[in-house]
Amino acid sequence: MNIIEIKELNRYFGEGENTVHVLKNISVNIEKGDFVAIIGQSGSGKSTLMNIIGCLDTATSGSYKIDGKETNELTSDQLSDLRSQKFGFIFQRYNLLSALTAAENVALPAIYAGKSQSERLARAEELLKKLGLDGKEKNKPSELSGGQQQRVSIARALMNGGEIILADEPTGALDSHSGENVLEILRQLHSEGHTIIMVTHDKNIAASANRIIEIKDGEIIDDTQKHPVQNTVNNQSKAKSRFGFSKDQLMEAFQMSVSAIIAHKMRSLLTMLGIIIGITSVVSVVALGNGSQQKILSNISGLGTNTMTIFNGTGFGDRRAEQMQNLTVNDANALAKQSYVQNVTPNSSSSGLLIYGNQSFTSTNLKGIGEQYFDVEGMTLKQGRSITAQEVRDNAQVALLDESSKKSIFPNDNPIDKIVMFAKRPFRIIGVVADRQMGAASSSLNIYAPYTTVMNKVTGGTKIDSITVKIADNVNTAVAEKSLTEYLTVRHGKKDFFIMNSDTIKQTIESTTGTMKLLISSIAFISLIVGGIGVMNIMLVSVTERTKEIGVRMAIGARKSNILQQFLIEAILICMIGGISGIMLSLIIGGIFNVFMTDFTMVFSTFSIVAAVLCSTLIGVIFGYMPAKNAAQLDPITALARE
């Protein structure tokens, strides 16, 4: 029964004038269970014929059938399955993967055949023991002799059953004793029912075969059969057809990726560096943005929540505002009666010289306020008490200091009930309030007194500088601002004031800081792109370096999708490690920053960290795809020929 049928097969290489006719109208049938030696000098076409038989190459024309199935009609994946299920390759140079142990090399074809880990390792150990390599399962190829490596190669060929064993100069790299051992193994496999096809240029080695086919200049010139083929039953296990990716294939691809990264530590580190810098930059910038935003919003809370301050004039740049003085205490009283208003405080101010004992302080701001001022502005009383409504009505000469002023005037004394002089008027200190958070630190002192006292006894005016309004909690501040504007405009007969809404400021700052974070993150993202290009470059180099490995994997049954998966996982792994390292570096930087900085801290968010990991993974997919695709598109013969 013919297992291989070849009819009028031709193979050309090159194009045009450079075309070389390597195989010329080859027609040959090989029976199942035969031991065939294809002999010929270098350049005769014998290796090309074996490559076509092993589905590593395709004919230019003619017919090639295996078990009656026309190979010219098969897809790339179907040819890979055929190599996995039917063939076992024995190479002259062994072609073992140096990073794997003997057992792992033997078990490799079973991964692509879809066998479980336990099943393939058990069979690998069984085959190694059968071939006299018991105890060598964990040895790397570099720890084995040439003869031992070739026996590992034979065991690998038998892993999935090896119904057809293709041996390319199997003794070419061995001494005579080791070569004879290999030939004895091939004869034994033949007796067990395997179909053996051996390529050699040595007639003495070819003599071991039952049938000798001699090729010269691409043509069969002699075909000698010694004995009829015995139809011995082959009881070797055969690989089952498989599809898609199995868990074992993914795990093996992951392990090989880790091995490749470890094998080139410095190169891998330098490749990751671009990703590390990019991720560190993005995460740190977002953390800085979050921290500064929280600090600014915390400072804004010093203005009070749901508060609006009404000023004279049309805006902060209005030079006529001081002369206009349109706001009055009556305006404040009228606003206090509105349903959307919770509290109101008129404000007046003056600046001048403050005297305590034999000390004088030239830069002192006196703020005239109502009894509800500290509640409206969200300021905390630290010591003593606040101003009462009665004191406002009585023009009482009482005052409060902020904490900074207290430290300057009374560094070691209790300020309560002490008398200070301002504008030649005595003021009794009744309390201390927390410093306002909004704004930069100032060298000026701040004291607070009833606005009636400031107006009647200090400035001598009847107008006020501003009115601060606290809006009720259940009222929309934008609606309240519109209503307040309409009310005062009608009351004054014109709009001679402007309003500063604390919520509007907060929203503006949030928007601004968000825009700045986006801008700086975009700049940092560029370094990620550069890092991704570095990953792609190194992966292209890796594909070139490991071309031989790719050819071996394809020869033992790996599909293009398996090769694509292998290198894509490696690129993703490099980027993920780089991304995680970048996040850890950013957290370390943040920890150090937060220890030494007191104004604000770096605030890391879970979202930014998760986004960074996903981003680095995506970079690996995008920039790793092209090198992985290049690897998958390699021709098996070209890859195997690469040194």
UniProtKB/Swiss-Prot annotation:
EC category: translocase
Topology versus the membrane: Multi-pass membrane protein
GO cellular component: plasma membrane
Sites where the protein binds ATP: G40, Q41, S42, G43, S44, G45, K46, S47
GO biological process: response to antibiotic
PANTHER family found in the cross-reference section: MACROLIDE EXPORT ATP-BINDING_PERMEASE PROTEIN MACB, MEMBRANE COMPONENT OF TRANSPORTER-RELATED
Assigned protein family: Belongs to the ABC transporter superfamily. Macrolide exporter (TC 3.A.1.122) family.
Stated name of the protein: Macrolide export ATP-binding/permease protein MacB
Organism for this UniProt entry: Mannheimia succiniciproducens (strain KCTC 0769BP / MBEL55E)
Gene assigned in the entry: macB
